[in-house]
UniProtKB/Swiss-Prot annotation:
Listed name of the protein: Uncharacterized protein DDB_G0292160
Lipid positions (N-myristoyl glycine): 2
Chain intervals with Basic and acidic residues compositional bias: 7-19
Cellular component, GO annotation: autophagosome; lipid droplet; Ragulator complex
Keyword field: Lipoprotein, Myristate
Record carries keyword NAD: no
PANTHER family cross-referenced by the UniProt entry: RAGULATOR COMPLEX PROTEIN LAMTOR1
Source organism of this protein record: Dictyostelium discoideum (Social amoeba)
Domain of life of the source: Eukaryota
GO biological process: cellular response to amino acid stimulus; positive regulation of MAPK cascade; regulation of receptor recycling
Length: 174
């Protein structure tokens, strides 16, 4: 690059590459932005030319698509308000059984839920890391207080009838 001949060769090569780039870009149509596609509609292979759609039309098409989803979902709901008196009796029996099961289940060792690990017999208290990793007395008291509070609240749960709960498991949006 230090001599005059190589500098003129460099300029010549730049001009040639610039001309090639301009020729190739003039042959290819340039598009600065890709067209928008509607949500939920798969692109067809036969569509080579993108359809020009205004923003408001795209918004209306998307709203129609979402409205269709909502309508199909509404058709799949189960109306439990039409349950006859026979269904209500079985519901009351199930509610009583469930309530009795919860009342009968007691937490025998509430501290085992949130207890912290203990030092094994093999660990020596002279080991500073093991000594410092032990919980403080305040932490132990705090954890036991919260554990007993949680245990009391769980054992005192009262269940009242609120109605049937229906959950549909399946492909409801297909």
């Amino acid at each position: 690059m230090g001599c005059v001949v190589s500098k003129s060769d460099d300029i010549k090569n730049e001009n040639e590459s610039r001309q090639r780039n301009q020729a190739s870009s003039s042959q290819q149509p340039s598009s600065s932005q890709t067209p928008s596609k509607q949500i939920g509609i798969a692109a067809k292979d036969s569509e080579e030319q993108p359809q020009e759609v205004s923003y408001s039309q795209m918004r209306e098409l998307d709203n129609d698509f979402f409205k269709d989803i909502i309508d199909r979902t509404a058709q799949k709901f189960i109306d439990v308000s039409m349950v006859g008196p026979d269904g209500k009796d079985s519901f009351l029996d199930r509610e009583k059984d469930y309530s009795a099961q919860i009342k009968d289940s007691k937490l025998l060792k509430p501290t085992s839920l949130t207890s912290l690990p203990r030092l094994s017999q093999q660990c020596q208290m002279s080991n500073l890391q093991n000594l410092l990793s032990q919980p403080t007395t305040f932490d132990n008291e705090l954890m036991s207080k919260y554990t007993s509070s949680i245990s009391e609240n769980l054992n005192g749960i009262h269940i009242k009838e609120c109605g049937e709960l229906v959950v549909f498991f399946g492909n409801s949006l297909k």
